[in-house]
Amino acid sequence: MARLRLLIGLIFCLAISLDSVLSAPVISQISKDVVASVGDSVEFNCTVEEVGQLSVSWAKRPSESDTNSVVLSMRNILSLPDQRYNVTVTEGPKTGSAIYTFRIQNIEVSDMGPYECQVLVSATEKVTKKLSLQIKTPPVIAENTPKSTLVTEGQNLELTCHANGFPKPTISWAREHNAVMPAGGHLLAEPTLRIRSVHRMDRGGYYCIAQNGEGQPDKRLIRVEVEFRPQIAVQRPKIAQMVSHSAELECSVQGYPAPTVVWHKNGVPLQSSRHHEVANTASSSGTTTSVLRIDSVGEEDFGDYYCNATNKLGHADARLHLFQTVIPVPSLS
């Protein structure tokens, strides 16, 4: 008799367990991930079997990595007062099943993200499945993309352009004024611009261009400044002049940061005075033209002059020689 009671008890427990398994809610189907444009209407469907009296809700998570969700609806009642939202519950294809449909009209960028269909089994247990809503947005270059950069000549340079948008934007690079890229060509289809052993000729503006087929491409001009030692060019290293006439000595200086230019004679720096005038003119190309003008040249003004240019990377000198010339007197014979 005791064995019979034990057997009956085991059968009863097994029946309860089996009934519990058979009646557990199951999300048998959920809509696939959705891709839409701003202003469209979207619809999510979630089919739940063995739902019984359990509560089924739609919820939105801020991101894939954030597990906290905001409940949007519970059964057929909206939890948030948004006129764009609508939720309905209809009978499912199987007995005891139901389809929970959540609709959003006139979607906005803020609607993008993961959505969950949730079946609340108990206070600590729920059955969930999720889908993702991706919204097509035109490319926007991110703020963490630099607007300028500084590099010393001879170093390597890497510039990475970041852009947001969906589909994921493609990045390309082009030089300002359609100039040739350091590696050749006029366009580089890479997110990162790499220049090995930067040269001063690489300085200038580079456009980061982002495009994904949605709206207009976005672009940003990034200024590349290259630091380099001063370099001096002299077109006329020897200047002939007569006494009592004016003379001009000229040198062209390049360098970054812009060098300080000083003229010397006999180791003494020359400054603008009644006898000497120094004029420095900077051009848009980064070249400084320095002119030393001497009014009414005297005997003591002849000799060597030095154009000296200095910046934080070094200095350069160029020698110019002012010598006396005379007008030949024609012979009377």
Curated annotation (Swiss-Prot):
Keywords: Cell membrane, Disulfide bond, Glycoprotein, GPI-anchor, Immunoglobulin domain, Lipoprotein, Membrane, Repeat, Signal
Compartment(s): Cell membrane
Membrane topology: Lipid-anchor; GPI-anchor
Signal sequence annotation: 1-23
UniProt GO MF annotations: receptor ligand activity
CDD domains for this protein: Ig
Cellular compartments per GO CC: extracellular space; plasma membrane; side of membrane
UniProt keyword annotation of NAD present: no
Domain of life: Eukaryota
Coiled coil: none
Disulfide bond sites: 46-117, 161-208, 251-307
GO BP term, pick one: maintenance of blood-brain barrier
Annotated glycan sites: 45, 86, 308
Domain Ig-like C2-type: 139-223, 230-323
InterPro entries named among the record's database cross-references: Cell_Adh-Cytoskel_Orgn, Ig-like_dom, Ig-like_dom_sf, Ig-like_fold, Ig_I-set, Ig_sub, Ig_sub2
Domain Ig-like V-type: 25-128
SUPFAM superfamilies xrefs: Immunoglobulin
Pfam families: I-set, Ig_3
Protein name (record): Protein amalgam
Record gene name: Ama
